[in-house]
Every structure is written in C-alpha cells, then in structure tokens.
C-alpha cells in the first residue's frame, strides 16, 4: 500500500540555476570536489544545483554560511 502522507519538507541550499546542463554540471563537479553533498534538480526547465536536504532550518543556514564563505552565491530553497 502506498503512503499518501505528503513528503517531508526539507531545506536545501541552492547555488545556481541554469538552462544549460553543462553549466550546472560544472558547478556540481566543483562543489562535489570540495565534498559538498551537491546534486542537480530539474525543475521548471532549469537545472538547479542544490546542496543538502535538511530537516532543520538551522542546519541549512549553517551550510549556506559555509558555502558563502567559500565564495558561492546561495539562497535557501524548500
């Protein structure tokens, strides 16, 4: 039987959104080479490069700060 409960909301840190896969992949590889848990999400025709999926807002905020300290542009997504 399928679980009909809504998916648990997670906080994610977005570092880029591109129409071009190659640009997104380049950023993904750079983040992963620095051991960030990055991935690409295709949404609304954009390849969104995001890091993490946190239950707690505080954890996402800490990751956002870490990424900004490394020079990445970021914002929190849900």
Predicted ranges, named:
Residues 2-10, 19-78:
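Extracytoplasmic
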Residues 16:
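Conserved beta3-strand ATP-binding lysine motif
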């Amino acid at each position: 039987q399928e679980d009909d409960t809504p998916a648990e909301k997670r906080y994610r840190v977005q570092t880029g959104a591109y129409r071009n896969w190659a640009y997104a992949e380049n950023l993904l590889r750079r983040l992963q080479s620095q051991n960030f848990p990055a991935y690409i999400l295709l949404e609304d025709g954009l390849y969104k490069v995001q890091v993490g999926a946190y239950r707690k807002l505080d954890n996402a905020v800490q990751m956002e700060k870490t990424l900004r300290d490394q020079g990445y542009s970021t914002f929190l997504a849900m």
